From Swiss-Prot:
Encoding gene per record: mraY
Family to which this protein belongs: Belongs to the glycosyltransferase 4 family. MraY subfamily.
Protein's cellular compartments: Cell membrane
UniProt cross-references to CDD domains, sorted A to Z: GT_MraY
Reactions accelerated catalytically: UDP-N-acetyl-alpha-D-muramoyl-L-alanyl-gamma-D-glutamyl-L-lysyl-D-alanyl-D-alanine + di-trans,octa-cis-undecaprenyl phosphate = Mur2Ac(oyl-L-Ala-gamma-D-Glu-L-Lys-D-Ala-D-Ala)-di-trans,octa-cis-undecaprenyl diphosphate + UMP
Domain of life: Bacteria
Cofactor(s), names only, from the UniProt record: Mg(2+)
InterPro entries in the cross-refs: Glycosyl_transferase_4 (IPR000715), PNAcMuramoyl-5peptid_Trfase (IPR003524), PNAcMuramoyl-5peptid_Trfase_CS (IPR018480)
Gene Ontology process terms (BP): cell division; cell wall organization; peptidoglycan biosynthetic process; regulation of cell shape
Protein known as: Phospho-N-acetylmuramoyl-pentapeptide-transferase
Amino acid sequence: MFLTLIAAIISFMVSAFTMPYFIKFYQLKKIGGQQMHEDVKQHLAKAGTPTMGGTVFLLVATAVSLLVSLFSIKNTQSLALISGILSIVVIYGIIGFLDDFLKIFKQINEGLTAKQKLALQLAGGLMFYFLHVSPSGISSINVFGYQLSLGIFYLFFVLFWVVGFSNAVNLTDGIDGLASISVVISLVTYGVIAYVQGQFDVLLLIGTMIGALLGFFLFNHKPAKVFMGDVGSLALGAMLAAISIALRQEWTLLIIGIVYVLETSSVMLQVSYFKYTKKKYGEGRRIFRMTPFHHHLELGGLSGKGKKWSEWQVDAFLWGVGSLASLLVLAILYVF
């Protein structure tokens, strides 16, 4: 536990110290920043804000985790577990980096196409499964304390889980500070679970990422001086999925990650309903003012018809939802 605390503090300090230099480099090189193509007018002022800040906190968390674990952990099984989780973080970080690179440096607005991104995500998921999950012999998922054996179909579950939550966190990263603190809340919860289980290797990874993210948040809260970009959000979502698998508590991510589930569900419902009503009535209709869900809240509160919410109000509400959901999971696991 002490080692995790030290690693978290180091990650925080390095991330917080390095981020201003990253931002200054972006500005000095006059690199094109984040582009805004949204109907939320208050976001237009953010155009040009440096992005890809996730590169910094991912490098910091990965480096600190590796250095501390190599010098302090002698158990080869623990080192294999750490390398497994870090591998999926790095792979998805590279995918996100490529997507951001095409948008910013090559001025390709959509970056990777949806098919290209999905293909790379599936390839990364397959590597994670065959190199780190399959050798462990795991082929079942924990469903509220019961082990449901999936056999070979566990492969498809892993792919769905990793790809799904990486994209879900990516959708959540739409307003200042929302994704970074939402992930911190999720990681703190998994840190408690890892501690209770005695999985201090996983706890070390969690601690370093929390520290690095908090260092990043100093520059990502409203008004944001930097965004994490796809390089950060895709990697963080994949990390949460991998941690839930490593701790054998897969089901908990549906509740701990309720914010990501809400954001993704809102997009899926909106698109499906729009297509259905367009086919039936000749014009598409919407359930939400705008998706993902945080934009619906910005434009009119919960009802979508009330007073507009500020980004801080949206953040506070969704962070609160995530915190309550996380407490519920801990209560289910260790109280009831």
